[in-house]
A protein has these predicted regions:
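Conserved N-terminal catalytic/coupling substructures associated with nucleotide/phosphate chemistry
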Residues: 1-284
Length: 285
């Protein structure tokens, strides 16, 4: 039996609704500060590269006051009292990736990581492969898709006198992972889980569908963004088009893959995308 949704709001959420009206019942938190993640947790080189490439702004040529103003207006940083902290979106995209010890994301926002596991069977044991990803976006998406590819057994088909391998559906998995990281509920303290079995691959995203959105509406391209700032940065990095076409694109790609099926469902406080694999793919596992 499914649990009832928890609509508990804090005082900030209530004040937002009073100020902005009923549309604010969708409470966005991706512009809020991450506790203890100060400006020293920022990957300044990535920030500079981003602004130069996307906005043609050279941060090397502006003073510190102007630089802070730009980062605050971009919702990468947020002032709290007399200090600057990374926002949730700021640490997700521009958190420092350290060579040793923890990355900024793992240190200050660990439940935003992505867990990838390959299981031998339905008993969840033994585990063939396991990977915890705490890279910033969008690099984390590339790393997870790469791990799926490494564990992907490629079937082949005979065409004429030649054996041709069926290519790995990289764009499909990229779209599935992008959909998960942009629409998950970051207030829930659990990671996105990607579980690989012989007959299916599950992408488990923390959080209910937003408000009146249903699975059928999603299939029709109707969506309400839970994390508009994250979606905006995904768009800037060319990983999303912000047009609500993610699920329709996924459905179209799956229809182009004979023997594959995709299933979407809500399970308690999680959203699941389950890619069912054809028998010839299962036999290779």
């Amino acid at each position: 039996m499914q649990r009832q949704r928890d609509y508990t709001m804090n005082i900030t959420d209530i004040l937002t609704i009073i100020e902005n009206g009923e549309n604010s019942l969708i409470v966005h938190i991706d512009d809020r500060p991450v506790q203890n993640a100060g400006i020293e947790s920022l990957d300044l080189e990535k920030v500079k590269s981003f602004f130069l490439k996307v906005y043609d702004i050279d941060l090397k040529e502006v003073n510190q006051t102007e630089k802070d103003r730009i980062l605050i207006n971009s919702c990468i940083l947020i002032p709290v009292n007399s200090d600057l902290f990374l926002t949730m979106a700021g640490i997700l995209f521009f958190g420092e990736k350290k060579e040793v010890l923890y990355s900024s994301l793992e240190q200050y926002f660990p439940h935003a990581g992505i867990q990838f596991v390959v299981y031998a069977n339905e008993d969840l044991e033994p585990i063939f492969d396991r990977y915890e990803c705490f890279e910033p976006y969008p690099e984390a998406i590339d790393s997870i898709v790469h791990k799926i590819h490494l564990n992907w057994k490629t079937p082949s088909k005979i065409k004429g006198m030649k054996r041709e391998e069926v290519s790995f559906p990289e764009k499909l998995f990229r779209e599935l992972v992008v959909n998960a990281v942009t629409h998950r509920d970051y207030s829930i303290h659990s990671k996105i889980q990607i579980r690989m079995f012989s007959g299916r691959i599950e992408i488990i995203t923390p959080g209910w569908l937003v408000n009146s959105v249903t699975i059928e509406k999603m299939k029709a391209g109707i969506s309400i963004p839970r994390n508009p700032l994250i979606i905006k940065y995904m768009q800037n990095f060319r990983y999303s088009d912000q047009l609500g076409r993610g699920i329709p694109m996924i459905l179209r790609k799956v229809r182009e893959m004979p023997g594959y099926e995709i299933e979407f469902k809500e399970d308690e406080d999680r959203f699941l995308a389950i890619l069912h694999l054809p028998q010839k793919k299962r036999d290779l596992f």
